[in-house]
Amino acid sequence: MQLLTIGINHHTAPVALRERVAFPLEQIKPALDTFKSIWLGPSARTAPEAAILSTCNRTELYCATDDQAAREAAIQWLSRYHNLPIGELAPHVYALPQSEAVRHAFRVASGLDSMVLGETQIVGQMKDAVRTASEAGALGTYLNQLFQRTFAVAKEVRSTTEIGAQSVSMAAAAVRLAQRIFDKVANQRVLFIGAGEMIELCATHFAAQQPKELVVANRTAERGTRLAERFNGRAIPLSELPSRMHEFDIIVSCTASTLPIIGLGAVERAVKARRHRPIFMVDLAVPRDIEPEVGQLEDVFLYTVDDLGAIVREGNASRQAAVAQAEAIIETRVQNFMQWLDARSIVPVIRHMHTQADVLRRAEVERAQKMLARGDDPAAVLEALSQALTNKLIHGPTHALNRASSENRDTLIELMSGFYKHSGSTER
């Protein structure tokens, strides 16, 4: 069984490509079924395992399979599922086998692979991915163990290093950008579209600047109202967005929509109604909520999640000592996991040996019972039984020694000598 991680992230692909391979939450379970099916068949020795992690910054497929062509099969599946030409997708995809897959999972959960170094949101996102895969029946021994250790390593890294200290979050970066456009956020009206965790973080940071007005527009009215009331704001229906957009100086959007909810025409009308006063817009969604053409309008300052990443990275350099500590912890834990994985690889062999030995035992016991039933001497039957079992049990090792090449025979002799030295002990 081999572990494999296939994916793209903010290091390897722009948001324009990442949004095309994102998985909406409701699509993940059925996607897992079709993903696993590429390895199901008469040649599969064990059931494949899979999990899908899809966030603003990454789409990753975690797999455990005995298919030697797993890498190519997984990339081709991702291409077909999202109707993307393989030539367009493949250059941006990373494929990480075995220890590389383990190391990657540990680094992702610890915040070392995030756009915001040390951010904690990814842990919750990974736990959601694991929960969804478990509910879909897609997890097994290997991925369960991988993710259990992943979360333990993330906890160890965050509790023993300063990896998350003084980090600049995406929400804080959005405020900094707004302050470059407007002298004071306190003089501006702010609209948040969505009511998820990222919008909640952004609302917290913007509310600290005491804007003139804070408004939340959300598809679910109750959730939008609840979030707005936390910050002494108000909520409006999402359906009113086109007619109310011109009222706001700052617009931050992050929904789970698979299609843009703010089009070029709506923003053009808003700019005209505002008499060309600037609008600062932040699109943190993947797939994007705001049509990218909006950024070409003269009076609109549109930033995506990738744009904010440049500001976030400014604060990453000061925490390189913590990164080195975290990497050392992760490397040790990777070696520990690989030792467990190596031990697991022996289990099928041991199970097969037990099965074969039991088949031989049953056959010889059945033969001995027939001999006893016809009146043969019990002592002679026991002697025949023991000789038959001895001959059959040593037939395999003897045959292997006889067939071994000269360069392998010495190694086999040494291994078997040590084996029979221990297994032949009569100590009680």
Swiss-Prot record:
The keyword Lyase does not apply. It comes from the Bacteria. The active site is at 56 (nucleophile). The keyword Oxidoreductase applies. It catalyses: (S)-4-amino-5-oxopentanoate + tRNA(Glu) + NADP(+) = L-glutamyl-tRNA(Glu) + NADPH + H(+). One of its GO terms (molecular function) is NADP binding. The record marks 104 as: Important for activity. One of its GO terms (biological process) is protoporphyrinogen IX biosynthetic process from glutamate. Possesses an unusual extended V-shaped dimeric structure with each monomer consisting of three distinct domains arranged along a curved 'spinal' alpha-helix. The N-terminal catalytic domain specifically recognizes the glutamate moiety of the substrate. The second domain is the NADPH-binding domain, and the third C-terminal domain is responsible for dimerization. During catalysis, the active site Cys acts as a nucleophile attacking the alpha-carbonyl group of tRNA-bound glutamate with the formation of a thioester intermediate between enzyme and glutamate, and the concomitant release of tRNA(Glu). The thioester intermediate is finally reduced by direct hydride transfer from NADPH, to form the product GSA. HAMAP family: Glu_tRNA_reductase. This is Glutamyl-tRNA reductase.
